[in-house]
């Protein structure tokens, strides 16, 4: 890869800023509607006692948790550390541009999603994980009562002693159950309050 081109791509991305998930309400509302309308019963395999995976809503949860990109996992580097290190960021960009490990793309086609993926998966890097909102909602559908005047039931309550990054909270909102949670991390809790209040 031509060093001059690589430097230009690097500088262009640095000028744009870190590729956080969008925070505008139109985008968030669209993603929320996709999450709510997802047919989560398709995830449940009762015979084998398995709840499948779907990424619906994870991006919404992450959009409230910008600080998560800088949280250490053991001795691994964080995505923010890669972003702030010119040498490593260039190596990651080069892997996208050359198609080494990542799908090959020309500079003008690299998206914020591509950048987030590269920053998460760069060698020696790890990002904190999140509970899938669809899996949480499917669990609540199975194990927690719902409000039903027909059946005379009230919505059940889930207590989450370590809320994490909003996946289970979003699942509770989608499933229509009460959710009580605690989390010791102040920036995380602020993000969770924003999810709750939106």
Predicted stretch roles:
Residues 1-51, 55-57, 73-198:
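Class I S-adenosyl-L-methionine-dependent methyltransferase catalytic core
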């Amino acid at each position: 890869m031509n060093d001059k081109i690589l430097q230009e791509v690097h500088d262009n991305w640095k000028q744009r800023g870190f590729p956080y998930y969008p925070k505008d309400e139109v985008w968030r509302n669209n993603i929320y509607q996709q999450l709510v309308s997802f047919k989560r019963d398709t995830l449940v395999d009762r015979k084998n006692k398995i709840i499948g995976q779907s990424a619906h809503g994870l991006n919404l949860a992450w959009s409230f948790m910008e600080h998560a990109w800088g949280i250490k996992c053991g001795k691994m580097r964080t995505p923010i550390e890669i972003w702030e290190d010119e040498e490593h960021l260039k190596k990651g960009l080069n892997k996208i541009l050359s198609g080494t490990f990542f799908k090959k793309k020309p500079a003008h086609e690299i998206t914020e999603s591509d950048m987030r993926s590269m920053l998460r998966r760069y060698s020696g890097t790890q990002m904190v994980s999140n509970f899938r909102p669809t899996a949480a909602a499917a669990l609540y559908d199975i194990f927690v009562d719902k409000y039903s005047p027909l059946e005379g039931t009230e919505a059940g309550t889930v207590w989450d002693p370590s809320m994490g990054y909003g996946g289970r909270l979003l699942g509770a909102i989608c499933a229509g159950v009460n959710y009580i949670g605690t989390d010791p991390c102040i920036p995380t809790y602020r993000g969770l309050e924003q999810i709750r209040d939106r």
